[in-house]
Amino acid sequence: MIHQEDKEFMDSVTAIIKENLAQDTLRPELIADKLGMNTRALYRRFKKISLLTPSDFIKDYRMMHAARLLVTTNLSVQEIIYQVGISNKSYFYREFSAKYGVTPGEYRRMQ
């Protein structure tokens, strides 16, 4: 069971990610800074309440948002990569395929 304080913390983290998603500077350090804590404290807090590290949480959020954009828009894959703040196309394809088992184009066609 998640405590209210932990839920509020994760809501704050998610809001920061949404606000900065298109920036390739979105990293745990940025989140920690915006929350007024150091990066080690952010990692400790995540370890206490999540199975993911802050870095993995950001990556997972980016991939989920990209998947949503593939289904709900006609944006090109390149435009989606830009919108989710990833600057390396091959990295995006590798991570997307690892998470969903198909390429972004295949994912779009399947939906």
Give short role names for the model-derived ranges:
Residues 1-11, 19, 33, 48-56, ...:
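Short, Lys/Arg-enriched, Trp-marked, Pro/Gly-tolerant hinge/linker segments that flank
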Residues 94-111:
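…primarily DNA-binding HTH/wHTH and HhH modules…
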Residues 14-26, 46, 50, 67-76, ...:
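Basic, amphipathic alpha-helical hairpins
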Residues 48-87, 109-111:
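Terminal helix-turn-helix DNA-binding modules in bacterial transcription factors
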Residues 4-7, 26, 40, 75:
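Conserved catalytic/ATP-binding subdomain
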Residues 29-37, 42, 46, 80-87, ...:
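Append "Primarily bacterial transcriptional regulators
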